[in-house]
Amino acid sequence: MNNPSTPKAPLADYLAHLPLAEEERARLGESASFSELHARLAGEGAASEAGGDPALASVRARLQLGSPELDDAEMFGVDAQGRTFLKISPPIRRTKVIPEPWRTNILVRGWRRLTGRSNPPKPKRALPRARWQRVGSLRRFILLLLMLAQTSVATYYMKGILPYQGWAFVDLEELTRQSLLDTVQQVLPYVIQFGILALFAILFCWVSAGFWTALMGFWELLTGRDRYRISGSSAGSEPIAADARTAIVMPICNEDVPRVFAGLRATVESMAATGEMERFDFFVLSDTNDPDIAVAEQQAWLELCRETRGFGKIFYRRRRRRVKRKSGNIDDFCRRWGGDYRYMVVMDADSVMSGDCLAKLVRLMEANPEAGIIQTAPKASGMDTLYARMQQFATRVYGPLFTAGLHFWQLGESHYWGHNAIIRMQPFIDHCALAPLPGKGSFAGAILSHDFVEAALMRRAGWGVWIAYDLDGSYEELPPNLLDELKRDRRWCHGNLMNFRLFLVKGMHPVHRAVFLTGVMSYLSAPLWFFFLVLSTALLAVHQLMEPQYFLEPRQLFPIWPQWHPEKAIALFSTTLTLLFLPKLLSVMLIWAKGAKGFGGVIRVTLSMLLEMFFSVLLAPVRMLFHTRFVLAAFLGWSVQWNSPQRDDDATPWSEAIRRHGMQTLLGLAWTLLVAWLNPRFLWWLSPIVGSLMLSIPVSVISSRVKLGLRARDEKLFLIPEEYDTPRELRATDEYTYENRWHALKDGFLKAAVDPLLNALACAMGTARHNRAQAIETVRGERIGKAIEKGPEQLDGATRLALLSDPVALSRLHAQVWEENRDDWLGRWRKAEADDPHAASVPLAQVVPGDAGLLPAAQS
């Protein structure tokens, strides 16, 4: 480990951080200056080829010292200016990716058609109508009838439950002849009831859709007789054609680098074990704008390639211009390298996929030439907080029913969730590029939730979108706590509301119009439920505080009495609970039938279900208020900030819980007092809502605790098969994550500017390779001068990123820091090394060719 109490001369200190033989270190130590040192490292002529920048000239030599395997893998290249670079990505072979402008206004579209300026969608593929399309249309028609029938009966019952039944006796002409106050008193109860009835019908129809989806999923999984199952079209052992090349792409942005590259390594090794590695390439597509994380990604890429011998198969690209977020990241990949591949598998930063699953997806694509997207059903795993474990259990137990049910109703016109799916590259390039939504405001601009839109465009072009719901080997992780989940929901809510602008776009398949609608209802149902509860409370207030109007028309002989039918209310309440909770019971019954050992046994899985149901009841009102806020914020253009502090073990601090849930607690308390004052008996009906709101702070904090999650696992509660018998890929991910965190790189930009090896790596991976021009030299000089003046603590992020992307500027900064012995840079770097218990001992030992050469932060 470094000892800052024994200062060294800068030249000797520099050489101590290069893995050299003692004789070579002594020879280089005779250099009179750093310029001479870099010239000796680079060899004769190299400095002149690098344009007179000695530190830039020695980049290759320094990299060879730290990572001699780069030479064996032929990873070095020289650009047009004679500067060394690493072949971190394949040669670019550009493909046109042209998004079609959206025409969301049907009036404008009609006018353009009348004036002969219509721009129709691109023509569909000339494919015969398959049998599954007719079957799917019939099934969805039946689903619609079931939902409407069920909703009609429930709404009829609800109408009979409401107390005011005399709306038909209200005479509009009579209302115009009386005072406004009398009119309000007479009509207000019926207006409120009408609002309650309308909201109830919408919400019940939404619940009904989920019920029938789960019910048919239960039938599919119980019988196993799904003749349209996409995974049944391949035996799973067919040879993959040599030209069926597949790119596995992982878009990332400011992610947890140790976890991301651990999961990717597990996936790469699993793929290699199948023997099909030659047909797959891996791409890490970074949109990271944090310089420290960007340097950590570069080092992690090198270590990953070294450990897996993946040079030339695992590629890395960081965008300097972050356009259109994730969809733009994918577009950029398709534009540069999409023409080299027949298929593309998209993974999230937390995704892990087995090699068998990846190979199976390619075989399914080969066996189904009409398929454009095949989506797997990722299994959630890998988290330890109590909240995450409950969510993992819920998605693992209940999720298969809903996924199989979606497949039953949608068949080849299904969902795409944006990750853990395979895509046919050419139609994706031709039809799925996303133009920004026209106009101004919060619902214009770059599309946020791209996945549903891409699936709709793929289907509009005539290609199928399938869910391989029974395909194993696809995994993901869930947010560790409620607040992190809500932060994700904030983005999804806005994105789904934006997508609804595409509901009437020409050529969209009716199923995908329905998908846009269900995406909106996933979040719009929250304010609808909230307003339903508010109107119910308002009706209670009207009933208690206003004198009933018994005679609603002149010369009426008999009064209209408010009515109350508790037996109907109980029946309707029971029916609603059945629709909500029967799918969960059916899921557990399916596990009973097929074997509950992986879930902890029959008793444990049943107890886990009951506990999860209890927590879901507690959390539903909390989510309702947050989602209501998100919807209102999106419509009103409000900015909702979520600047969560760094947490230990992903736990929610009490201070943050109070800040996020404090208003909900006060609302629950005020609501309780109001209803208790109006009619205490009504609290029995409202207690699950207001009680959950008042308990939101402790529930949010306690459920985020890792200790409680681990204790539940020890008791076999919320156990999932991936924990009982952990797949090889998940075991490897955990192991590699632990290893990566052990030597995780900190202060990445500082070390890229100062450390001899990391500076060489960053320079070789820099992508801003400009020709020589006076204007460029002026900008470089300004950036370097700013870095020297401000120091590592005060330098802004934009300048750091610009320096990191420019190998010339970064090498000059590196040289100037050492030549001038800049204490603000060198002192900060030495302190960071001293504070790192896993930093390498200096002087670094020589790396023998063929050994696993390591960068400094990776040694222990």
Curated annotation (Swiss-Prot):
SUPFAM superfamilies in the record: Nucleotide-diphospho-sugar transferases (SSF53448)
Compartments in which it is found: Cell inner membrane
Spans traversing the lipid bilayer: 141-161, 187-207, 515-535, 572-592, 599-619, 682-702
Membrane topology per record: Multi-pass membrane protein
Enzyme class: transferase
Pfam families: Glycos_transf_2
This enzyme's EC code(s): 2.4.1.-
PANTHER family: CELLULOSE SYNTHASE CATALYTIC SUBUNIT A [UDP-FORMING], GLUCANS BIOSYNTHESIS GLUCOSYLTRANSFERASE H
Functional summary from the UniProt entry: Involved in the biosynthesis of osmoregulated periplasmic glucans (OPGs).
Protein name according to UniProt: Glucans biosynthesis glucosyltransferase H
Species the sequence originates in: Pseudomonas paraeruginosa (strain DSM 24068 / PA7) (Pseudomonas aeruginosa (strain PA7))
Lineage: Bacteria, Pseudomonadati, Pseudomonadota, Gammaproteobacteria, Pseudomonadales
Gene: opgH
